[in-house]
Amino acid sequence: MDALINLKDCKEYMTITINGNEHQIKLAGIIEDPYFCGKDVCTILGYKDKEQALRKRVKSKHKKSLSELFEKKLPVVTTGNFFLGTQNELSYHEGKSIYINEPGLYNLIMSSEAPFAEQFQDMVYEKILPSIRKYGSYSIEQKLSSAMEQLALKDKSEEELQIKLQEERIEKENAYMKLRSEAKRHKEQIKRTLEFNQATKQIEPLEYIYICTTEYYQQHHKFKVGGVQSFKDLKSRLTQYNSGESNSEAHFFIYVRKTVSYRSIEHIIKGLLSGFRENQSNELYIMHCDWLVKFLDAIMDGNAEFALLVNSNREQIALDTINKEPTILPPIKLEQIAYIRAGDEPRDLSSVLGQEMIDSIKEAIESFEPMDNTVKRKEFELHLLSKSPNVSLTGKRRDTWELTRQLGSSINPMWRYKY
């Protein structure tokens, strides 16, 4: 960094060389109280919005327009030849230019993010301003200039490295904080959802499932299975059925049992016992009473066991859902759905089938020409046996087919497989 001020040759500006780039700063005022062109200083210090920097960073008492300085000429007339700045008549725009004094200069330097700002400040404070005041001229010797330039380049390289490392660290910290923030937000969202849905509240068997019939229906193995939300609804339900005509005088219950959700029980019964319904338009089941009660008890027992399992683990389920890391399972390939489930490790079929079978499958694949690129299992097995009659598929058909798909996909990706 180099600065050159020769007030004998030029009283209007000083020249500063920073990292090989030469800059001029226009001057105004007097030797005892110099003012610097604010726009020039902002340019050197890297301010993008110069007007905003001068407006917000420099106090009013530390800045003046050039026209104000020019008109007042700052009441010192004894300095004569050392009055700084242009002596020519100012244009309108020149007169509006903002100049800053020493405190204003420090304000801009302290607020600057330029890597050399601190060095610039030291130079202004220790050398430039004292030189202006005492001698009216200042220059940095060539050796010092060269040394400063090399130091600036070295500092710049090290500073750029530090800036890069700092930026990477900040980027990583920001990414980490963002992940933590997102994780926290998701946790809070899940927690609010579970609290709103009362996930930790114990479920109580307050509803009822029943079997209802009449004397006539009972003699013909006909029964109505239904449910209600409360005990008081049981009696009123007897008069509400629309289960077809009956020769008996009234319906009555032969089975009543508490449950958590009668609708889920009804849904299961309709799904499993739909073939025993009188027809699809009514809800009469035709089945021996002993079997119907057995089935209903089995469903109810399973439902009660499930409710017990949920109730005994509700708080832990909620805590795991909020705090535990997600379990990520690999997707199930549809062609493998009969053989593996999510989380299972694929088997090493080469150790299961042996090298002789593998070689036979490869040979059969290379000579196989499926119609429409669709490989059908039975057709390929016949082709395999015709090429290698000594191989046996007994107990190995699924493994053979699985390996055929794996090897075939690598040979011809266009092939499709039909079991």
Swiss-Prot record:
This is Putative Bro-N domain-containing protein 201R. The keyword Iron does not apply. Keywords: Coiled coil. InterPro entries: BRO_N_domain, Phage_T5_Orf172_DNA-bd. It comes from the Viruses. Residues 4-136 form the Bro-N domain. Belongs to the IIV-6 201R/289L family. SMART domains: Bro-N. Residues 150-195 form a coiled coil.
